Curated annotation (Swiss-Prot):
One of its GO terms (cellular component) is cytoplasm. CDD domains: SirA (cd03423). GO terms for biological process: tRNA wobble position uridine thiolation. Keywords: Cytoplasm, tRNA processing. Belongs to the sulfur carrier protein TusA family. Interacts with IscS. Its main location: cytoplasm. This is Sulfur carrier protein TusA. Sulfur carrier protein involved in sulfur trafficking in the cell. Part of a sulfur-relay system required for 2-thiolation during synthesis of 2-thiouridine of the modified wobble base 5-methylaminomethyl-2-thiouridine (mnm(5)s(2)U) in tRNA. Interacts with IscS and stimulates its cysteine desulfurase activity. Accepts an activated sulfur from IscS, which is then transferred to TusD, and thus determines the direction of sulfur flow from IscS to 2-thiouridine formation. Also appears to be involved in sulfur transfer for the biosynthesis of molybdopterin. Pathway: tRNA modification. The active site is at residue 19. The keyword Lipid biosynthesis does not apply.
Length: 84
């Protein structure tokens, strides 16, 4: 495993869930996190390859790292400073 993924503040397992559930859970989880904390998202829905980066751009969170070559996909998101 990658050290950066290992250091995530929280982990969200969305394996088996399909669009739009993974992104909805990411949004709900990030709302309850402190600014600057990181979230590791584990997913197997192919739509997350598009949806999670799009969510991060729209909400201005930092997508620090992603692994999408094979399932399970992994995304590391940092809650943007100044976001409530």
């Amino acid at each position: 495993m990658n050290a950066q993924f290992d250091d995530a503040t929280k982990t969200l397992d969305t394996l088996g869930l399909r669009c739009p559930e993974p992104v909805m859970l990411v949004r709900k989880t990030i709302r309850n996190m402190a600014q600057g904390e990181t979230l590791l998202v584990i997913a197997d829905d192919p739509a997350t390859v598009r949806d999670i980066p799009g969510f991060c751009r729209f909400m201005e969170h930092d997508l620090l790292q992603q692994e999408t070559q094979a399932t399970p996909y992994r995304y590391l998101i940092r809650k943007k400073e100044g976001q409530l």
